[in-house]
């Protein structure tokens, strides 16, 4: 029987989602816990890969358990298909604090967490002053940033384009075309600021409001290339600092298929395209923040 699972995880202890030899990953952690509880090997398929250190909120995966009578689920007298609430409770009891299961439910045998996903959302957090309460999940850059220019550049991402300039080199995907449906920067107020009335010392004359000292970038698309979001954020920060124009950013967003990524023998060209964009930002401030079906 097939089950879907909704979970969140802190990516800092893991070398990404996907199982890899000699490294602890979220997928392996889940498979180990499920195998312990069901008494049989369990393979977990996720909605997509996240890189080392990247976090997730609302991540979706699926797994199969043997038919009735073939296993003792959790050693609690449940044979075959386990009760979702019981299995969810037991999973949270043995999973590390860095992983939490929000829900678990039976799905059809043809449900696929990766291939059935129509949209994936990512959020990247940024702050501009020293703050120990957001440091772990946000990137601190105390630069003067032109958010109007950054949002004008971000709006150019919308639509179906070839994002080869933002793809990590050395990947083996057949196409670098993605359809982006949402991309923008916005301010937010952290919990400790909102609830405790905390505010840093009075800002210098003409400084921006405190709300714009904490901001995030949100992007949604049907699919993402490896390292794509981090490369986009790094390049948008160059726009915000005035080191790259909005027009130059626009030149990195290619018409669908222009990079020739659908054909063989283009690795060298794709590598040279990546060098045109900015540096990737660190992964600790990136969240896979939702999956739609």
What are these language model-derived features?
Residues 1-293:
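Structured-RNA-binding interfaces characteristic of tRNA pseudouridine synthases
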């Amino acid at each position: 029987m097939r089950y879907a699972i909704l979970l969140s995880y802190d990516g800092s202890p893991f070398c990404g989602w996907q199982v890899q030899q000699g490294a602890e990953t979220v997928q392996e952690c889940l498979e180990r816990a499920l195998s312990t509880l069901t008494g049989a090997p369990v393979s977990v398929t996720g909605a997509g890969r996240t890189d080392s250190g990247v976090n997730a909120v609302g991540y979706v995966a699926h797994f199969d358990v043997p038919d009735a009578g073939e296993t003792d689920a959790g050693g609690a007298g449940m044979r075959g298909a386990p009760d979702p609430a019981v299995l969810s409770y037991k999973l949270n009891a043995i999973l590390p604090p860095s992983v939490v299961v929000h829900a678990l439910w039976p799905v059809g045998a043809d449900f696929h967490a990766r291939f059935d996903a129509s949209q994936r959302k990512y959020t990247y957090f940024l702050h501009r002053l020293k703050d120990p309460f957001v440091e772990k999940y946000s990137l601190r850059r105390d630069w003067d940033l032109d958010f109007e220019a950054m949002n004008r550049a971000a709006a150019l991402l919308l639509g179906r384009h070839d994002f080869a300039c933002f793809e990590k080199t050395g990947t083996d995907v057949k196409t670098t075309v993605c359809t982006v449906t949402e991309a923008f920067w916005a301010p937010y107020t952290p919990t400790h600021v909102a609830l405790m009335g905390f505010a840093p010392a009075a800002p210098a004359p003409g400084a921006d409001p405190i709300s714009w000292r904490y901001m995030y970038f949100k992007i949604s698309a049907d699919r993402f290339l490896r390292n794509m979001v981090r490369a986009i954020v790094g390049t948008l920060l160059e726009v915000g600092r005035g080191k790259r124009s909005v027009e130059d950013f626009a030149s990195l967003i290619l018409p669908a298929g222009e990079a020739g990524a659908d054909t063989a023998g283009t690795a060298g060209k794709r590598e040279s395209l990546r060098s045109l964009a900015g540096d990737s930002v660190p992964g600790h401030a990136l969240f896979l923040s939702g999956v739609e079906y």
